[in-house]
Amino acid sequence: MQNHHHQQSSYGGGYPGQAYREQHPPPNPYGYGQPSPQPGYGAPPPHNGYATAVGIRPAAATYWKRGVQWKTAWYVIAFGAGRNASALESVKYAAADTCNTGMNQYQNPYSHGHQGGPPPPPTDPVAFGHGAPQGYSFQYSRCTGKRKALLIGINYFGQKGQLRGCINDVKNMSTYLNQNFGYAREDMVLLTDDQQNPMSQPTKANILRAMHWLVKDAQPNDSLFFHYSGHGGQTPDLDGDEEDGYDEVIYPVDFRQAGHIVDDEMHRIMVRPLRPGVRLTAIFDSCHSGSALDLPYIYSTQGILKEPNLAKEAGQGLLGVVSAYARGDMGGMVSTAVGFLKRATKGDEAYTRSKQTKTSPADVIMWSGSKDSQTSQDAQIAGQATGAMSWAFITALRKNPQQSYVQLLNSIRDELATKYSQKPQLSCSHPLGKH
């Protein structure tokens, strides 16, 4: 297995941002604060299934979507009413996708093969700029402090929609963090549904408890890491902060009894308490996860901030009007046009509200396996079940550990492009500088 001991830049994605302190990871000052659900978790790293998969593009044709098979059951159980795939597609997030602009990777200045590693981050507070609360600033983390990680993988054994690769995702990611970025085993909490200890099961209560542990007592220049592999979905938005009218949710192993966890709650627990200069890196390998932490700044593969773009919905709205006209349904024409105008107005208002209320003085970066409207896929790669997003993330970093955030987004998409339709997303709690 190849190890990369590089001095990582915290700005722009020296992922996960730590200035790796050569030979000695930092001591563990406080452990799991609730107390630890995993006493004695200091065993040797699990087998790294990626050792045989490095450099191999996803070649297997077998995959399972993380969410699509459970869609009807989820909405009946969790929301009280079913919603099928076609209805979900009709309200999909319509931000502009600049990935298909006709530019190849060599024309894209943010392509991981085109430029060197990112510059060091600014050391002083940085102004948010347009759209953020007046006078508000954030601060990048130097990532020289403590490191803590929470990794969750749920295969849903014995349940409808069982997955195969989520636990492997956690094992692979924890090994990668430990061997390449100095995350000590005693500073990681792993919640997977193959463990015997009840406190290590990924139940709703355990997940929420562990989220609180992750951010507890975080100080400037600390580096926190969160990884979720499992089912994701959407539920009607109740607080008006979602452009598409739906909140994103994740499903604990006991979601049928305890319910799901909404993005608003994850933001409240893991983002809102963070101080300036604290880094939180989050990975969501699940369906409909584009804005799973409710971070307000979403970036394209060109490094361009995505403003609300309702062009796709505009096209759908016009098609609806034309279709109604062809049927002679004048009432349908009016209803379709008015409905689109309402969605357009609500989308712009939600985006402005999100930027004003969900910004953070901390340094929060999130990669997700798909857009809010897409499914993520369970794959079979080099004989091992794994999440396509998790596999691509580690593979891209093994090939080039020195990448900016946007470069890494391009690298991940490149790894997935030949076999998978999902498009990983990059979102932040603050605007990215032009570096």
Swiss-Prot record:
Keyword set includes Hydrolase: yes
Gene Ontology cellular component list: cytoplasm
Keywords noted in UniProt: Apoptosis, Hydrolase, Protease, Thiol protease, Zymogen
Pro residues bias: start-end ranges: 36-46
Class of enzymatic activity (EC top level): hydrolase
Reported function: Involved in cell death (apoptosis).
Name under which the protein is recorded: Metacaspase-1A
Source species of the chain: Neosartorya fischeri (strain ATCC 1020 / DSM 3700 / CBS 544.65 / FGSC A1164 / JCM 1740 / NRRL 181 / WB 181) (Aspergillus fischerianus)
Gene: casA
